[in-house]
Amino acid sequence: MANNTITVQLTRSPIGRLPKHRETVKGLGLRKVGQTRELEDTPSVRGMVNKVYYMVKVVGE
């Protein structure tokens, strides 16, 4: 089984957003706008990305 990863970038600030959404961004390991993280491609990570779709962008899969 291949080690699948996705690259996620924070495109908008979590300031002024719902507290649950801010915690989700923090859970993805994103702090600053423009920061990217390479994460495992799991259903839980995909769900977190879908929850804050308006603040993050999937750069690479």
Swiss-Prot record:
SUPFAM superfamilies: Ribosomal protein L30p/L7e. The keyword Ribosomal protein applies. GO terms for molecular function: structural constituent of ribosome. InterPro entries: Ribo_uL30_ferredoxin-like_sf (IPR036919), Ribosomal_uL30_bac-type (IPR005996), Ribosomal_uL30_CS (IPR018038), Ribosomal_uL30_ferredoxin-like (IPR016082). GO terms for biological process: translation. It comes from the Bacteria. One of its GO terms (cellular component) is cytosolic large ribosomal subunit. Transmembrane segments: none annotated. Keywords: Ribonucleoprotein, Ribosomal protein. It holds the Pfam family Ribosomal_L30. Part of the 50S ribosomal subunit. Belongs to the universal ribosomal protein uL30 family. HAMAP family: Ribosomal_uL30_B. This is Large ribosomal subunit protein uL30. The lineage of its organism: Bacteria, Pseudomonadati, Pseudomonadota, Gammaproteobacteria, Oceanospirillales.
